[in-house]
Amino acid sequence: MSESTRTSRAPAEKRLTYQQWKRRKMLRLARNWGLFLAGCAAVVALLTGGILWLLPKVHGLLAGPKVFAASVYDGTDYVFDAADARLTLVNANLPYTAEPAPLLDTADEATGQQLEAEAAMQYRSMAAAAQADGVSLILVAGYQDADTRQAAYEARVQTYRDKRKSEEEAARLAATIQPAANANEHGTGYAADILSADNPQQDTGFAETRAYEWLTAYAAEYGFILRYPQDRQAATGIVFEPWHWRYVGVENALAIRASGLSLEEFIALQRAD
């Protein structure tokens, strides 16, 4: 063998002793177990997080939708104030003697609708509370000036003219839904037409919504009452309007709701006492 061949051959690899081989094997085994356990921990963490996220949703499905229940109000300490402007009645029998000029504030930023300042503040609080319960309220009509009110009334009359009703009959039917300008309480700034995204139309279908259920239970706690209840047309002159709410102040609203009466009936009863 030549000298060049001997110098280019790689040196022989040093063989491990049994102890060295055994130690290396144990280290490799420990590393593999560590990786396996870390993977298991990651899987457990993912499963636990998923279960914790899913549990409240499953509970919600099993329990059903939240029930909105009104608080009990006995009215023992209620004091009726006939001079309270928030109780002002406006209807066909009690029309405006002068055009109102309420101090207004924006009640719903999304729609730009305004209410009387105190009513607007209470509406904002009410809408926020409803939102916290998963209910979105939409104020579609608040304060309206005389021209707006009259235009709405005339449009309603025209719908009955189009149905070939006489002028007298068209006016009479229109007034049960859309009062004439001088009998429409939207001029006070206390009237609020409230709807929801799932029922954006002013019709009795709103009475089947979660928003109406919420309002029926809690609106009085913010000073609002259902202005034209079902089966009260003889007293109010207006058909059932589940979207039309009226600000009267918290104590008044709680007392009126507890009585089960319309605003007209409640005021008449209080004045008779």
Language-model features, listed with the residues they occupy:
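Extracytoplasmic cell-surface/polysaccharide-interacting catalytic and binding patches
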Residues: 2-273
